[in-house]
Amino acid sequence: MELQTVVKLDKPSFRIDYSTRLMMLGSCFVENVGAKLEYFRFKTDINPCGIVYNPLSVADTLELLLAGKRFSQADLLRNGELWVSLSHHGRFSAREAGDCLQRINSRLEKSVAHLKTTNVLVITWGTAWVYRHRQLGRVVANCHKFPATDFERFRLSPEDIEQVYTDLLSRLHSRYPDMRVLFTVSPIRHWKDGAHANQLSKAVLLLAIDKLKQRLDYVSYFPSYEIVMDELRDYRFYTEDMLHISPQGIEYIWEKFQSL
């Protein structure tokens, strides 16, 4: 007797084993699975700019790595007592600009080197909603508690994402033709605008990935979102906020991921 709907895993054209070098970019879900990979001593580099949730900020991280970018003080903003980067998570912020730059540049340098030997790039998107800095005219990875009036918030379309990533991944593939890209959508729900808006956001991400899969033969998809929605359809697999996935849920998805 089947007591749950089981999500079928489409095997990608590659295998992940101890010879595989991985880079993982995106939401906190990437950090959860990445922590498992690191624990079992896989060669893994996770989020050189910290946690990023939307597709354009993940693309920005990749652009920084491809360009071998080194940040200067001109790339930072002052917010109260802290120097911050709009491309980075708050863990890179510091009271002194030099300390902030040291954290950013040393981490980027490590990841630039790792990318050159990466076999599998894992990208997890969490939301299609983005914040664009009005004065700078660019989408940010983190608002760093600047006033809400500094930003314009809007939802990307599948076409927006497809256009950016078709160009970006084509350039990446041209430089590293043996690299494979594995997309996932984070099952963590973004509840700010309610249930319906969260589903619309996830749908945008899923449609964009499907378009990229059809267009680029080195792109694959791992259904972490579907596994949680169908196989783990129970709040005991969530943390107390009822939005994030519990350790037990992460363990379940990790077991599925290992079968790739």
Segments (PLM) and residue ranges:
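Extracellular glycan-modifying ectodomains
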Residues: 1-260
